[in-house]
Amino acid sequence: MSFMSRVLLGVNIDHIATLRQARGTRYPEPVQAALVAEQAGADGITVHLREDRRHINDRDVELLAQTLQTRMNLEMAATEEMVVIACRIQPPHCCLVPEKREELTTEGGLDVVGNKAWIAQCCQRLGQAGIEVSLFIDAEESQILAARECGAPAIEIHTGGYADAQTIDQQQQELARIRSAVAFALAQGLIVNAGHGLHYHNTLAIAEIPGINELNIGHSIIARAAITGLDEAVRSMRSLLDTV
């Protein structure tokens, strides 16, 4: 694979902060984890600043913005508070995601069709701040078209249905749906990323989809890091993507 066509790896470090918050300690330090991930081959670092600050907090985001050698992708809800924070910190990338306080993790894609006016306004304000905006959406043509109409240059396809499939047939159906959505989005001129629920045994099929720009992967890497160490966990995922 040529370097120019390689699938980028965004490492989500939210669960480093989850471990810290479990005891209310100062450790482990998300910034330290981010730097290790970068050195191990991550192309970027993803963090989700949730409205309830259940893991990543404002201080983490500010320090990461000052210290990362690659780039930060800030996941956030499409709220006034988060848009103001992002415009102040100015990360290179923002991904607008749906958010519910009661959920354990993001449960589905953003409903761009049903909230087009507000999301378009968010995209405009973030874009004017020099931030490349992506929208985390399900693999549906209507949502892809709405994302383009909102002025978002990129989307992130929600791969949760594929990752959570209970049978091989169901998984293959979800994979076909994602492939079709990626091709459709590329035809609309969008940058296409993907993520959610990806791990060492299901990522390759997504990475092999033509036109995929970046995969954002977190929980599985941090889970493996608890056993093997973060450097090895990131290198293993990077090596997996490099086989494409």
Curated annotation (Swiss-Prot):
Pathway: Cofactor biosynthesis; pyridoxine 5'-phosphate biosynthesis; pyridoxine 5'-phosphate from D-erythrose 4-phosphate: step 5/5. Pfam families: PdxJ (PF03740). It is found in: Cytoplasm. SUPFAM superfamilies: Pyridoxine 5'-phosphate synthase. It is an enzyme of class 2 (transferase). One of its GO terms (biological process) is pyridoxine biosynthetic process. The keyword Transmembrane helix does not apply. Its EC number is 2.6.99.2. The record marks 156 as: Transition state stabilizer. GO terms for molecular function: pyridoxine 5'-phosphate synthase activity. It catalyses: 3-amino-2-oxopropyl phosphate + 1-deoxy-D-xylulose 5-phosphate = pyridoxine 5'-phosphate + phosphate + 2 H2O + H(+). One of its GO terms (cellular component) is cytosol. Keywords: Cytoplasm, Pyridoxine biosynthesis, Transferase. CDD domains: PNPsynthase. InterPro entries: Aldolase_TIM (IPR013785), PyrdxlP_synth_PdxJ (IPR004569), Pyridoxine-5'_phos_synth (IPR036130). 1-deoxy-D-xylulose 5-phosphate binds at residues 14-15, 50, 55, 105. The active site is at 48 (proton acceptor), 75 (proton acceptor), 196 (proton donor). 3-amino-2-oxopropyl phosphate binds at residues 12, 23, 197, 218-219. Its main location: cytoplasm. Catalyzes the complicated ring closure reaction between the two acyclic compounds 1-deoxy-D-xylulose-5-phosphate (DXP) and 3-amino-2-oxopropyl phosphate (1-amino-acetone-3-phosphate or AAP) to form pyridoxine 5'-phosphate (PNP) and inorganic phosphate. NCBIfam families: pdxJ, PRK05265.1-1, PRK05265.1-3, PRK05265.1-5. Belongs to the PNP synthase family. Homooctamer; tetramer of dimers. This is Pyridoxine 5'-phosphate synthase.
